[in-house]
From Swiss-Prot:
It is found in: Cell membrane. Gene3D superfamilies: P-loop containing nucleotide triphosphate hydrolases. Belongs to the ABC transporter superfamily. Carbohydrate importer 2 (CUT2) (TC 3.A.1.2) family. It comes from Caldanaerobacter subterraneus subsp. tengcongensis (strain DSM 15242 / JCM 11007 / NBRC 100824 / MB4) (Thermoanaerobacter tengcongensis). ATP binds at G38, E39, N40, G41, A42, G43, K44, S45. It is a peripheral membrane protein. This is Putative ribose/galactose/methyl galactoside import ATP-binding protein. Its EC number is 7.5.2.11, 7.5.2.7.
Length: 501
């Protein structure tokens, strides 16, 4: 690591009703991978948005390569050499890899874009990263991890000195994560600085040099990563020692409430059969693309299936739409809460009552605002949703609080069966435990809960049984207390192994 490249001193930022940052200090050295961690709402995003020119600071100073600078726009940040790779990737899917890399800076010859030259230059950048991607391939045909590589190549093409990566591994597999870490290693060798934001603390020791912890808008500590344990970091993040990472409750399971028999859907799902009991958390494990989300969407009526049957409380039901599923006592919390789970421009209150409007309108279909408000206040209180007010736009909440809003919406309908798809993706360790406690409360109430998760420690920590999938098939249904992560991974790759043999 070299000398300090960026130094932020006493940075403060206030929004209506919220002090987002309070005299925060942060620095990154040349050729350093520096982790920025903290609970949702700690101030990480605000600090990064100030550094990348999205927000202006209220007070404080920023130094770049020894000189004080003002960063008033994303363009000014780019001119300094600061690039951001967001969790939601910023690519044009209908353009090629090369076209995305040089978008707005095309190679032009005789008034026409020189595609050949553009592809050649893109290939050079990708080779520099040791990444094998065809520059002429359309981005829409690439996996999320490959699209990330295109974003990194784009940053390099703009001569980025600092690359900010926001939750880069949240939607990619373990193998793809390894590839990303190799690329980060290459960037480090080239003297690039990486600010790495992640809630997956266990992965940081593989790439990170130093770590800075924020809590409630304040700088808590900056230290060499090797001098801290994961438990130390968690304690600095939440301000207390967490006794249990995966709180568990034991309940005598009740009757069988859901049966799925022979569910098939083209080539995506093949003969899916399983059951779910009252007071049970049933996990679904498997690699990316195994078909877990497809099962959830089929059961909930979001996607059609070709054959098979669904029984609830022993009776066959026809579920052809989400409305049918809701009428039959099912709730679904999707993996992409921002895209399909929330109305981001609406208030917290509107999102909570979205699925139960019949409870808050009178005979003239006019909303009873007093009744609606009481319902919203109860959900916020019961689930400990952190929000300045009921009328705050839900897009301004942290990931963990957004997730609680979706859960609260379904609680009002009192469903019998809950399906959670990646319920803790992109949320911090403290918020994760709050989500686990909500699941445990539902379990104690005798609800049946399906949890789809790509994090095996989470599957092992909170479920009673686990359904393992590979390539659209169920390869095993295991008692969680009697299995291991290694056995789950064996069954998660079973058909891949057979094919390779």
């Amino acid at each position: 690591m070299g000398e300090v490249l960026i130094r932020m001193e006493n940075i403060s930022k206030e929004f209506p009703g919220v002090k987002a940052l309070k005299n925060v200090n942060f620095e990154i050295k040349k050729g350093e991978v520096h982790a920025l961690v903290g609970e949702n709402g700690a101030g990480k995003s605000t600090l990064i948005k100030i550094l990348s020119g999205v927000y202006s600071k209220d007070s404080g100073k920023i130094y770049f390569d020894g000189r004080e600078v003002e960063i008033n726009s994303p363009k000014e940040a780019q001119q300094l050499g600061i690039s951001v790779i967001h969790q939601e990737l910023n690519l044009c899917l209908h353009l090629t890899v090369a076209q995305n890399i040089f978008l707005g800076r095309e190679f032009v010859k005789n008034g026409v874009i020189d595609e050949k030259k553009q592809n050649e230059e893109a290939k050079k950048i990708l080779e520099k990263l040791n990444v094998n991607i065809d520059p002429a391939e359309y981005v829409k045909n690439l996996s999320v991890s490959r699209q990330q590589m295109v974003e990194i190549a784009k940053a390099i093409s703009m001569e980025a000195k600092v690359i900010i990566m926001d939750e880069p591994t949240s939607a990619i597999s373990e193998k793809e994560t390894e590839e990303l870490f190799k690329v980060i290693g290459e960037l480090k060798k080239q003297g690039k600085s990486i600010i790495y934001i992640s809630h997956r603390l266990e992965e940081l020791n593989r790439i990170v040099d130093r770590v800075t912890v924020l809590r409630d808008g304040e700088h808590i500590i900056t230290a060499n990563f090797r001098d801290l344990t994961i438990d130390d970091i968690i304690r600095y993040m939440v301000g207390r020692k967490l006794e249990e990472k995966y709180p568990r409750v034991y309940v005598n399971r009740g009757k069988k409430i859901l049966e799925v028999h022979g569910l098939s859907q083209g080539t995506r799902l093949k003969d899916i059969s399983f059951d779910l009991y009252e007071g049970e958390i049933l996990g679904f494990a498997g690699l990316v693309g195994a078909g877990r989300t497809e099962v959830a969407r089929a059961i909930f009526g979001a996607d059609k299936f070709d054959k098979g049957e669904i029984l609830i409380n022993g009776k066959k039901v026809e579920i052809n739409s989400p409305i049918d599923a809701i009428k039959n006592g099912l709730a679904y919390v999707p993996e992409d809460r921002k895209l399909t789970g929330l109305a981001l421009n609406l208030s917290v209150l509107a999102n909570i009552t979205l699925a139960t409007m019949d409870n808050v309108v009178n005979m003239l279909s006019v909303i009873n605002s007093v009744k609606e408000r009481k319902i919203g206040e109860k959900i916020i209180r019961d689930l400990k949703i952190k929000t300045p007010s009921l009328f705050q736009r839900v897009q301004n909440l942290s990931g963990g609080n957004q997730q609680k809003v979706i859960v609260g919406r379904w609680l009002l309908r009192e469903p019998q069966i809950y399906i959670f798809d990646e319920p803790t993706r992109g949320i911090d360790v403290g918020a994760k435990i709050e989500i686990y406690n909500i699941l445990n409360n539902l379990k104690q109430e005798g609800k049946g809960i399906i949890v789809i998760s790509s994090e095996l420690p989470e599957i092992m920590g909170i479920t009673d049984r686990v359904v393992v999938m590979c390539e659209g098939r169920i390869t095993a249904i295991l008692e969680t207390s009697k299995t291991t992560q290694e056995e789950i991974m064996y069954y998660a790759t079973l058909y891949k192994k057979e094919r390779s043999n």
